[in-house]
Amino acid sequence: MDMPQMKRPKDVEKWVGEIKDFKAVVEEFTGNEVTPEKLHAATVLLNKRRKALERVFACRKADPAPISGKDALLMMQIAFFDDPQRCTDMANALADELEKRIADGVGVAPAGTKRILLAGTPMAIPNWKMHHLVETSGAVVVCEECCTGTRYFEHQVDETPTDTDGQIMALAQRYMKNNCACFTPNTGRIDDLLRLCKEYKVDGVIDVNLKFC
């Protein structure tokens, strides 16, 4: 799929066209029609998954941090290919556990441990090197501003459209809200980083830049 690099109205329309082309390929390859009912059910399910993942990240704002960055990253990496309902259930169960840890004052590192935000390139399995380096050096990773982090779950897809065209437009609009590094100009990403630094009370930011990405 050809991802637009700007967010003008014509870029949104271009992305709508890409989604429609992808839908046609999926239907031809699988022999299954993508109906409004099926698309609505999938949208609702994936919105629930986003909310569950967001609950876990909200817990990471606590000090002491109730979960290591490496464990949180593994959850996000698995979310890309796990069954969506199972992922939602397990993420909510994890959030329940983390909320109890916060209430009990339990953390993976002492309160006051330096808090790091990783930004930039997504980190796919088995890429845990940056988290390992940070967390074996006396700090804790509390947030990832990348596609295996906040970009994956921020912003819900509008569930109100009842026809396929409206649903595809809702999908396009949701994904265009992401401030991916491929967009230009990209002041929105700077705003996101500043917001996340405040929300997660970070002491430092490390920008991860995967060569050739």
What does each of the following model-derived ranges do?
Residues 16, 24-153, 159, 186:
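A charged, amphipathic alpha-helical module
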Residues 1-36, 143, 147-148, 153-213:
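Trp/Phe/Arg-rich N-terminal binding region typifying the photolyase-homology
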